[in-house]
Swiss-Prot record:
Pathway it works in: Carbohydrate metabolism; D-tagatose 6-phosphate degradation; D-glyceraldehyde 3-phosphate and glycerone phosphate from D-tagatose 6-phosphate: step 2/2
GO cellular component terms, semicolon-separated: cytosol
Entry binding sites for dihydroxyacetone phosphate: G181, G209, A210, S211, N230, V231, A232, T233
Annotated signal peptide: none
Known role: Catalytic subunit of the tagatose-1,6-bisphosphate aldolase GatYZ, which catalyzes the reversible aldol condensation of dihydroxyacetone phosphate (DHAP or glycerone-phosphate) with glyceraldehyde 3-phosphate (G3P) to produce tagatose 1,6-bisphosphate (TBP). Requires GatZ subunit for full activity and stability. Is involved in the catabolism of galactitol.
Documented EC number(s): 4.1.2.40
Protein's UniProt name: D-tagatose-1,6-bisphosphate aldolase subunit GatY
Enzymatic reactions: D-tagatofuranose 1,6-bisphosphate = D-glyceraldehyde 3-phosphate + dihydroxyacetone phosphate
Keywords of this entry: Galactitol metabolism, Lyase, Metal-binding, Zinc
Active site: D82 (proton donor)
Cofactor: Zn(2+)
Length: 284
């Protein structure tokens, strides 16, 4: 079976000292680039989508595409619900065949976050679906949800253990100074906090907001326990900027099969770099 949960992927990464990249896809071309590049490099990857992406493309359509491409390339893939907040929405997508879920209740008080996440875990584990949850909040924007940088909360290491034990999650997304979107200046990551979290929690740890981070910072987070790296904005920016440039230089272009090639090439460079930064080439 080529469509898999992320649990084994991330456990393998934790044992092997590398990270699995989760690429947020937005259209067919993004998925083609991610899967083709990963297959060529024999690298494990996760195909992730926010609620907005699943609404845009359709859950059944995305599942069919991932399944078909995994079989075509003989390459295991996970399709993952990124930053989903509603139980009924998650349940419907799990019943449709999704095998990896992030329930994001990080905006709630600690006790309510635990309660909401545990409800999802109890349901998902009945279907052998892996569950990620977040403790603390990232700044920036994901879909229509805006978090003010000033109000963004970092993950508390001691609370992280309580949270993991109380909810039964399979992986924990931590906040240590990253944000959604690209950075105006280099972020200062709290590596000591991450090291502390690793001492309290033995689950695979997840880093959101990795677009634009330096190779050095990404590799340092992996050394300190990060097993999954999320990338979204970097792919979108590469796609859109390349497309704008091409159409500016070739105003006569009308065939998407032609003018999308430059955008795909730009995204391919991003995917290859992220796979290299994660150290997961040859690990699939």
């Amino acid at each position: 079976m080529y469509v898999v949960s992320t649990k084994q992927m991330l456990n393998n990464a934790q044992r092997g000292g590398y990270a699995v990249p989760a690429f947020n896809i937005h259209n067919l071309e993004t998925m083609q680039v991610v899967v083709e590049t990963a297959a060529n490099l024999h690298a494990p990857v996760i195909i992730a989508g926010t609620p907005g992406t699943f609404t845009h493309a359709g859950t059944e359509n995305l599942l069919a595409l991932v399944s078909a491409m995994a079989k075509q390339y003989h390459h295991p893939l996970a399709i993952h619900l990124d930053h989903h907040t509603k139980f009924d929405d998650i349940a419907q997508k799990v019943r449709s065949g999704v095998r990896s879920v992030m329930i994001d209740a990080s905006h709630l008080p600690f006790a309510q976050n635990i309660s909401r996440v545990k409800e999802v875990v109890d349901f998902c584990h009945r279907f052998d679906v892996s569950v990620e949850a977040e403790l603390g909040q990232l700044g920036g924007q994901e879909d229509d949800v805006q978090v003010n940088e000033v109000d963004a909360l970092y993950t508390n290491p001691a609370q992280a253990r309580e949270f993991a034990e109380a909810t039964g999650i399979d992986s924990l997304a931590v906040t240590i100074g990253t944000a959604h979107g690209m950075y105006a200046s280099a972020p200062v990551l709290d590596f000591s906090r991450l090291e502390n979290i690793r001492q309290w929690v033995n689950l695979p740890l997840v880093l959101h907001g990795a677009s634009g981070l330096s190779t050095k910072d990404i590799q340092q987070t992996i050394k300190l326990g990060i097993c999954k790296i999320n990338v979204a904005t970097e792919l979108k920016n590469a796609f859109s900027q390349s497309l704008k440039n091409y159409l500016t230089e070739h105003p006569e272009a009308t065939d998407p099969r032609d003018y999308l090639q430059s955008a795909k090439s730009a995204m391919r460079d991003v995917v290859s770099k992220v796979i290299a930064d994660c150290g997961c080439e040859g690990r699939a």
